[in-house]
Amino acid sequence: MAQETNHSQAPMLCSTGCGFYGNPRTNGMCSVCYKEHLQRQNSSNGRISPPAASVSSLSESLPVQCADGSVPDAQSALDSTSSSMQPGPVSNQSLLSESVAPSQVDSTSVDKAVSETEDLQGPRAEGLVPLECDPPSSVSDTTQQPSEEQSKSLEKPKQKKNRCFMCRKKVGLTGFECRCGNVYCGVHRYSDVHNCSYNYKADAAEKIRKENPVVVGEKIQKI
């Protein structure tokens, strides 16, 4: 048993024959030889894949072809769509024709509407007869009355008599106005002096009748 354990623990040399000890984890090679082995594998894989220089050359050749005129199909499709989306040049004549057309339509429609209204109103207007209405007489009388009152108010008020009717003496504010309608001075103010025409007796009798009505008892009816 001891011999077997010693035999298993004995170191093993590198499989490449470099003289160093190998490791079963690195396929029996030493660390240096294992690194070189990995580098060789990587280099061999890189030769199979296309180099970076060829890729850059392809990317440079594409814009050159586009400049020469050989445009890819995708680029031509994009150009065609963009050209279809862009509006074409609009001429001044087309704009003028579009602006004039609505105005002509509006004017023609207005003329038709006016002609129709005239046709409808024509027979009715011919059949109608204007009526003349005279203002009522009461209204005319009421309008004339204020005018007459205004004319009277505009007239100058009559001046009061300031002279005695008998002696023609100026009495001013000290004159006495009699019931007969004349003004007299202090001497001629009495009715018996200036022979007054006013009937004082009849006036007094009328006042007595109004103030003292006749009182008559009811008659006794016989049974």
From Swiss-Prot:
It comes from the Eukaryota. The modification Phosphoserine is found at S49. It comes from Mus musculus (Mouse). Keywords: Acetylation, Apoptosis, Cytoplasm, Metal-binding, Phosphoprotein, Protein transport, Transport, Zinc, Zinc-finger. This is AN1-type zinc finger protein 6. The gene is Zfand6. Interacts with PKN1. Interacts with TRAF2. Interacts with mono- and polyubiquitin. Interacts with PEX6. Interacts with PEX5 (Cys-linked ubiquitinated). A zinc finger (AN1-type) spans 158-204. GO terms for molecular function: DNA binding; polyubiquitin modification-dependent protein binding; zinc ion binding. The modification N6-acetyllysine is found at K219. Zn(2+) 3 binds at C178, C180, H194, C196. Zn(2+) 2 binds at C164, C167, C185, H188.
